[in-house]
Amino acid sequence: ENLQAEFLAINPFGKLPTLVDSSISMPNGEPLTIFESGAILLHLAESYSDDIKTIENKSLTNQWLQFANSTLSIALFVPSHREKEFPRLMKELDRQLATNQPLVGSIWGAADCAIQAYLAYLPLLFPQINLDPYPSIRTTIEHVQQRPAYRKAMGHD
């Protein structure tokens, strides 16, 4: 569907996800259209949430979005990096998640969503990866899999 003319009129790159925010108008009167998950998450957090209103939280959220969409995704999806970088990154990420606190601020937000989206891929795409050394990551994945939005997106409800 994303390569059909109707979608390409919204996003000429034909990529998912894409967000059309009709509450914000561009100078030409068209609704704001954003693609790339990190940009969408940042827009939603800045526009519709109080979790990144400070410069510190905005900077930290941006850091986690960049980490998820570059460092973590490369370590996960590029085989040579998966062997070299993945264990080290997972060890530190497990330590970060062990606090059971949001990555930024006091409520679950864009940073958590970005990281947890990639972690949720692990059991689906890489069932051979042993997550036993990363108990906090395992727990995080289990919690993600129980979220109503995740269950709906995966067709479980």
Model-derived features: positions:
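GST-like domain detector, emphasizing the conserved glutathione-binding G-site
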Residues: E1-D94, T99
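Phosphate-coordinating loops and pocket residues in cytosolic domains that bind phosphorylated ligands
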Residues: A9, Q146, G155
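GST-like fold's C-terminal all-alpha helical module
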Residues: E56, W64-R151
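Exported/periplasmic ABC-transporter solute-binding proteins
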Residues: T140, H156-D157
